[in-house]
């Protein structure tokens, strides 16, 4: 048994030198500058594939030599923290660069494009082993990263002409059909500050309001509502005088002749409110300002005598550009506290909003004339007042109303 252990121990002593002294495989000589270099190799189904490239060779992460130490204040040597670095080397090898003679007129510390190295993390020189070569590489490294090419300064010339929704007058001519052509065909000539709301650029001519008779005829109907739901309307005096008696209760009903309204400004200038901005009246119930005492007036006339049978009321709504024709832009909005009607735009009031009616609770069934007037008191100058009135024939049965023959009328 002792002899077997001795033989095993001597065999291991003879086998270890054989492993250490075995000749290692010779390393391949460095590739010549500009030669193809194998960068990626893989095997699939017994076949070996290689991807060759002339680009820079990727060097794996390296750690600093473990023998590199830094002296302490007490004289003892302490190992520096090992920082992994990622070195990207150019296509030229070290031996090829060593054989390249340096010109006499070039300074020794001047970096060359072919010998630059970029480090992914911080690197400090050390005094061990190849410290001199690392210090040389550190000197040749650029102190700052290269500037990114996609960080461009802001440009002010790439904005489009006509890309300002608050400036419908985008051409310097006097054509009232402004902004008719495509506004994205030519670049903006210079920096142009966007003006505020309600600003007119050149107000040549006058506005011209025209109500839409077909819009009224298509959606006229009768509705009954309780006084409880008409509190806001009663605050703005949109009901007949009988609705304000002391004996009227919240569950009493009123009969309303509802109809929509759409007014277009077909002139060449903005239709602006007659009252100055500081005198606009705030209505907390509807949460908007009334900028005119009377923008529209609604009357119900007898068909034969033309006598007023229902108490008409003034409608002083909030003026805004609800919609515009193609090529025109909205510039006035009640929510932005700017009121007016731009050329080519419409101020539309649906039939289901407050005060868009005539109170016909005390009207008997029969044939009547519905008269809708815009700018009735001529408080705002217009180019034509003969198209401000719409007259419709109304047949009221006591439960339903039928509108027909709505036309533009001069009176």
Swiss-Prot record:
InterPro entries (alphabetical): LOX-like_protein, Lysyl_oxidase, Lysyl_oxidase_CS
Residue positions where 2',4',5'-topaquinone is found in the record: 349
Name of the gene this protein is made from: Lox
Pfam families recorded: Lysyl_oxidase (PF01186)
Record PTM text: The lysine tyrosylquinone cross-link (LTQ) is generated by condensation of the epsilon-amino group of a lysine with a topaquinone produced by oxidation of tyrosine.
Binding site for Cu cation: 286, 288, 290
Source organism of the structure: Rattus norvegicus
Subunit structure: Interacts with MFAP4. Interacts (via propeptide) with EFEMP2; this interaction is strong and facilitates formation of ternary complexes with ELN during elastic fiber assembly; this interaction limits interaction of EFEMP2 with FBLN5.
Protein's job: Responsible for the post-translational oxidative deamination of peptidyl lysine residues in precursors to fibrous collagen and elastin. Regulator of Ras expression. May play a role in tumor suppression. Plays a role in the aortic wall architecture.
Cellular compartments per GO CC: collagen trimer; collagen-containing extracellular matrix; extracellular matrix; extracellular region; extracellular space
Enzyme class name: oxidoreductase
Name used for this protein in its record: Protein-lysine 6-oxidase
GO terms classed as biological process: aorta development; ascending aorta development; blood vessel development; blood vessel morphogenesis; bone mineralization; cell chemotaxis; cellular response to chemokine; collagen fibril organization
Disulfides per UniProt: 232-238, 285-334, 318-324, 345-355, 392-406
